[in-house]
Each structure stands twice: as structure tokens, then as C-alpha cells.
Amino acid sequence: MTKRVLISVSDKAGIVEFAQELKKLGWEIISTGGTKVALDNAGVDTIAIDDVTGFPEMMDGRVKTLHPNIHGGLLARRDLDSHLEAAKDNKIELIDLVVVNLYPFKETILKPDVTYADAVENIDIGGPSMLRSAAKNHASVTVVVDPADYAVVLDELAANGETSYETRQRLAAKVFRHTAAYDALIAKYFTAQVGESKPEKLTLTYDLKQPMRYGENPQQDADFYQKALPTDYSIASAKQLNGKELSFNNIRDADAAIRIIRDFKDSPTVVALKHMNPCGIGQADDIETAWEYAYESDPVSIFGGIVVLNREVDAATAEKMHGVFLEIIIAPSYTDEALAILINKKKNLRILALPFNAQEASEVEAEYTGVVGGLLVQNQDVVKESPADWQVVTKRQPTETEATALEFAWKAIKYVKSNGIIVTNDHMTLGVGPGQTNRVASVRLAIDQAKDRLDGAVLASDAFFPFADNVEEIAKAGIKAIIQPGGSVRDQESIEAADKYGLTMVFTGVRHFRH
């Protein structure tokens, strides 16, 4: 009995060659629309879909394969006489292979000028229906949705006259993943169109970007997936120019670092990060000086860290950086000389380029945190703040220099693990106290790291001070200016302590917990 294949593809890469090989193996080819035209023009004999259905393609191609003669040929079980008799009685010929890929819905909605009507017209109906019918009946039918699978199917057909059950099952699984992802994108698009912020069902779709050797630890399996609708300003979209593949921990740290530097876009800034916490942030009039400040913030912790710069890396900056062991450098661009310096000196240094012109688009993305049996979803902590909205709650007002330093410190504290404390001046971090289970311990840790650089320093806290003992510790160290959200039932005690020691303290009214 002659084998039949139905081919209907929007991505025509390799389809002519695939069809030609099937013809050599004696297969009969049914085809639709533009696919049939492409095959006919290449000299591949095909049967029109309307010759199979008895109905013409209609309604601008919306209806062409939704017919019992197609789906009966796909769904009939070859091991059930009743199915085969029903097919024979209704003059339905069996279809043994389906090659379908779908209307380019994703590519359509990514176009900057896409209209709602364009998006709707690129929702495929017949294609997913054929794919699902064939995949359901994979015991008898081979289904191909990915051109990358053409070769393995041809090899098995040439060698054995049919594909193996294992191959059919694997291809069916790929189809169901593919159609689920396709529908998820459509659901996401329509959900956004109607402004639904809390849908009762949430389906996320990601594409495998990189299999990983292991996860956070060697005993943990891991892979890296990228959003199906990519975000330009993200570690997943960065272009790697040198070095080994990024590890699981590299990716998490790099993501944290590029989030930080979004808040410092107005001036040349360098962020150094280790284990998801900033260990140095430097800001200056030029990127070379900003690097020096970031390095001097903590010359010990930066060893083996990740550095992100928000300006092009020049040769002078590269010369200074290459003397420090770093895991990753990320910048918008590099001069040819700078890149040569970094690569020649550090063959394994991971160097990435990430354009910073899409930062604001990245801020609207939701954050997903997995818990056992569930998923937490929240907006990113990107609230727009202005010093004009802050309140000086002490008798003493900040000096101009202190005000600048407090603003710098407040940007930085958002990214320190809670309970988080940071000590800075107006252009660099001096001490970081992350992740302690009581706030006064974080205060002591940050102050101890800043040590003899406390003259003129300020301190920021990611949340309110529950007791005045924090202010006592700060005053004892000689720090004269504090910024914190406020909001404790004991705020007045902290204010009185600050006044007692002649400190200035600013309340922002916004908490920045980070877990």
C-alpha cells in the first residue's frame, strides 16, 4: 500500500529536499496552499488538499484541513478493524506522516507595528489540529513539527520503510510541547490585550538556551531557558565575546548585577557583585575612575566576582581590570584595543556585550519565585522615587554632600540581601552588611567593613530600625547621616537618638526588602 504524507509548512527551509527524498521512497504527497506551490515549482508531484476533502480552500485559507477526510486519515487506529472499516466505508484514505509547522504568531507580535488584526490572522487553527491528531495516534502516524527532525525521519524510512515507535513517541512529545507553547503565547497576548493582571490560569513558555553542567552545586541538574518572547536587556540576550560557557551561579549573579546598574544610568558606573550581593559600586565622570572606585570599595571581595559597566570599556579601563581575577565582565561595548587587552591576558574570562538601551522595557517584567508546590508572582521593585518626596525627620538637615551621598546609598541598598545595610559616600560603597537575621548585626558588619573610611560616610537601611540601638551603633562609629524607610512603631525612639547625637535622618516611605 502506498504511504501518504501531508505537508503544510510556513517555514519552508529544507522542505523541498525532504519531499524529494520521500518521492524517491515512493510516498504520495498531499499539500496545501503555498507549500504546494513551492513543491510544484520544484518539480515535486503533489495532491491538492481539496482533492482529498472534496471542498475548496475557503475564507482566505481559514478552512482547508478541518475535514473528516483529513482527521479520519490521521486518527484511525491501524490495530482496530472497526476504525479501518469506518475509514473504508467513508472513503477515507489513511495518512502515515504529517509535516506541519505553524503560522508565525510569535514573529508577528514581535513586529513593532503589528496590529491586533494581524495578530489574530496569524493564529493557526488547522495546523495545531493536524499536529495533535497525528501526535495522539503516534502508534501509527509519524508527526514532524521541527525541520531539524527531517534527517532522522528520512534515515529511518530509508533503512526500515517506517519510523520506530520510539521515534514516533519522541516526535509526538515534541509536538505537544510545541502546541502548548504556541497556545501559551496566544493566551499571553490576549490576556495583555484585555488588561487582565491576575489571570486564573498562568502558563509560561520558555525555550532552551543552554544545557548546563550542573546547577548551584555539582549534585544539582540544571538548564537555562530564555523567554519565548525575549527581553533585549537581560543576561539571556547578552552576546558572549570570550570565555567559557556561563555557569548557573554566573547567570544568577550576572542577572543581579545588571538589575543594579539600571538604577545608575545617569553617570558612568561600575558594579561589582559576589553571591548576589554588591561588593562594590563606583560612580564617576568617566568609566575608568568609576572602576577604580568600585574596586577600592572592597578589593578582597571583588576577587572572582562579576563586574558590570554602563559605558564602553576603553583601553585604560581594561588595563586596570585585567590585573584582577574576575569571572565575568559585562558592558554595552568594548573598544577593539580594550577587548584585545582583556582576551590576551585572560583566555577564560567571560566577556559579554549587552546593549543598555532597553533597560526600561526590562523593568515591566514580572518576577517568578518557585516554592514547593507553587509559584509566587510579583512586579519588580522598580518604583520611581524622588528625593523631593522624602522627609527629613531630625532637627539637623543633610548637607548638600550628604544629600548626594544619601541618594547614592538609597539606590544601592535596594540590591543588598535583607536585613541589608550599606555604608557609602557620594560616589562609592564603603561597607555592605547583607543577610543578617537582626538589623543591628548588619549595621555592625557594614561599619566594620568600612573601617577607617567613615569620615563623611552615610548609611542606608533597606527597612526601618525596630529599635534605637541601630542609631546608637551608627553614631558610635561617627556616621552622621542615615536614610531608611521609616514605619516602625518605635520610629520616634530612633529619631530622638539621632537628634541626641546630632545626626540627620531621612525617611523615604518605601521599603526595599530583598530575599
Swiss-Prot record:
Molecular function via GO: IMP cyclohydrolase activity; phosphoribosylaminoimidazolecarboxamide formyltransferase activity
Keyword Hydrolase listed: yes
Pathway terms, separated by semicolons: Purine metabolism; IMP biosynthesis via de novo pathway; 5-formamido-1-(5-phospho-D-ribosyl)imidazole-4-carboxamide from 5-amino-1-(5-phospho-D-ribosyl)imidazole-4-carboxamide (10-formyl THF route): step 1/1; Purine metabolism; IMP biosynthesis via de novo pathway; IMP from 5-formamido-1-(5-phospho-D-ribosyl)imidazole-4-carboxamide: step 1/1
This protein's UniProt keywords: Hydrolase, Multifunctional enzyme, Purine biosynthesis, Transferase
SUPFAM superfamilies the record matches: Cytidine deaminase-like, Methylglyoxal synthase-like
InterPro entries: AICAR_Tfase_dup_dom_sf, Cytidine_deaminase-like, MGS-like_dom, MGS-like_dom_sf, PurH-like
Short name of one Pfam family: MGS
Catalytic activity reported: (6R)-10-formyltetrahydrofolate + 5-amino-1-(5-phospho-beta-D-ribosyl)imidazole-4-carboxamide = 5-formamido-1-(5-phospho-D-ribosyl)imidazole-4-carboxamide + (6S)-5,6,7,8-tetrahydrofolate; IMP + H2O = 5-formamido-1-(5-phospho-D-ribosyl)imidazole-4-carboxamide
EC number annotated for this UniProt entry: 2.1.2.3, 3.5.4.10
Domain MGS-like residues, every copy: 1-145
Annotated Gene Ontology cellular component terms: cytosol
GO biological process: 'de novo' IMP biosynthetic process
Family matches, as Gene3D superfamilies: 3.40.140.20, Methylglyoxal synthase-like domain (3.40.50.1380)
Family in the record: Belongs to the PurH family.
Domain remark from Swiss-Prot or TrEMBL: The IMP cyclohydrolase activity resides in the N-terminal region.
Name of the protein described by the UniProt record: Bifunctional purine biosynthesis protein PurH
Source species of the chain: Streptococcus pneumoniae (strain P1031)
Organism ancestry: Bacteria, Bacillati, Bacillota, Bacilli, Lactobacillales
Gene encoding the protein: purH
